[in-house]
UniProtKB/Swiss-Prot annotation:
GO terms for cellular component: cytoplasm; DNA-directed RNA polymerase complex. Residues 1-231 are annotated as: Alpha N-terminal domain (alpha-NTD). InterPro entries: DNA-dir_RNA_pol_insert, DNA-dir_RNA_pol_RpoA/D/Rpb3, DNA-dir_RpoA, RBP11-like, RNAP_asu_C, RNApol_insert_sf. Its EC number is 2.7.7.6. It is an enzyme of class 2 (transferase). This is DNA-directed RNA polymerase subunit alpha. The gene is rpoA. One of its GO terms (biological process) is DNA-templated transcription. It holds the Pfam family RNA_pol_A_bac. One of its GO terms (molecular function) is DNA binding. Belongs to the RNA polymerase alpha chain family.
Length: 325
């Protein structure tokens, strides 16, 4: 009779595209596929270190709802395009970059002036389009971080020296764009009740899918080491209770789900602004939404499933304090 737990002996990595891979690991004892798969997925989505633009100052712009002469996009669209630029910083936690461009044509990520220790993963990404006589002059602050940090959370009250025209951005630091897992049956000799774990992961190119899984595993091991060295301590009297932390992915706006314009507008008409708002709605509730049909509902369900979420989930302490609508 075997008393030791099986560990995966087969690990396969299938590259599906740039930054996209399927990782297969087997065999696991029954139940361990879901136990480890769900833990890795949550860590991959919330705890990977990445880089994102966090503050922008644009010459001639006072706030994000302004427009610029000679620039086809309004400032809101320009900032959305800027968030799509993938930065990678080497041996530093933040940097302020300059982008200056004049004359008709597209403004690309490669037009940003870079020091030697800053890299662009997608230099051909389009930020804006200039018309004849157009000009764009902006300062971009890029920081290192993890997860998703809404701009309103980053507006610190002690910051009294605010620069006029400084725009604070919602920052999505995570280099992991999508991750899902599935558990299939595996067999070893006469045992047929084993698990095979299949992880489908897509990154933005800052790290490879394999490295993302390695890093997430290290985070889990580091956290579990606390339990391995568990020693009881007496709790202080009258210790105040803390509200459970909210998963950062739930604080993201529904726009981050990249739904069709029709679906996104239907959700906003029902005051569904954040992913945390959306997952608490049931299918029947969404189908009662004007102009949102079965096709849009299926699209929403598929996008949520790719992030390990479903409709009809229950959340405590939602919405969290300070969340803007």
């Amino acid at each position: 009779m075997q008393n030791s737990l099986l560990k995966p002996r087969i690990i396969e990595v299938e590259v599906l595209g740039a930054g996209h891979a399927k990782v297969v690991m087997e065999p696991f004892e029954r139940g361990y596929g879901h136990t480890l798969g769900n833990a890795l997925r949550r860590v991959l989505l919330s705890s990977m270190v990445g880089y994102a633009p966090t503050e922008v100052t644009i010459a001639g712009v006072v706030h994000e709802y302004s427009s610029l002469d000679g620039v086809q996009e309004d400032v809101v669209d320009l900032l959305l395009n800027l968030k799509g630029v993938v930065f990678k910083l080497h041996n530093r936690d933040d940097v302020t970059l300059t982008l200056k461009k004049e004359g008709e044509g597209a403004v690309l990520a490669s037009d940003i002036e870079l020091p030697h220790d800053v890299e662009l993963v997608n230099p051909d990404h389009v930020i804006a389009h200039l018309t004849a006589g157009g000009k764009l002059d902006m300062q971009i602050k890029v920081e290192k971080g993890r997860g998703y940090v809404p701009g309103n959370v980053r507006r610190l009250s002690e910051d009294t020296n605010k620069t006029i025209g400084r725009i604070i951005l919602d920052a999505s630091f995570s280099p992991v764009r999508r991750v899902s897992y599935a558990v299939e049956s595996a067999r070893v000799e006469q045992r047929t009740d084993l698990d095979k774990l299949v992880i489908n992961i897509e990154t933005n190119g800052v790290i490879t899918p394999e490295e993302a899984i390695r890093q997430s595993a290290r985070v889990l091991v580091d956290q579990l080491n606390v339990f391995a060295a568990l020693e009881g301590t007496e709790a202080p009297a009258d210790a105040p209770s803390r509200a459970p932390a909210v998963d950062p992915i739930l604080l993201r706006p529904v726009d981050d789900l990249e739904l069709t314009v029709r679906s996104a507008n239907c959700l906003k008409a029902e005051n569904i602004y954040y992913i945390g708002d959306l997952i608490q709605r049931s299918e029947n509730e969404l189908l009662k939404t004007p102009n949102l049909g079965r096709k849009s509902l299926n699209e929403i369900k598929e996008v949520l499933a790719s992030r390990g979420l479903t409709l009809g989930m229950k959340l405590e302490n939602w919405p969290p304090a300070g969340l803007e609508k």
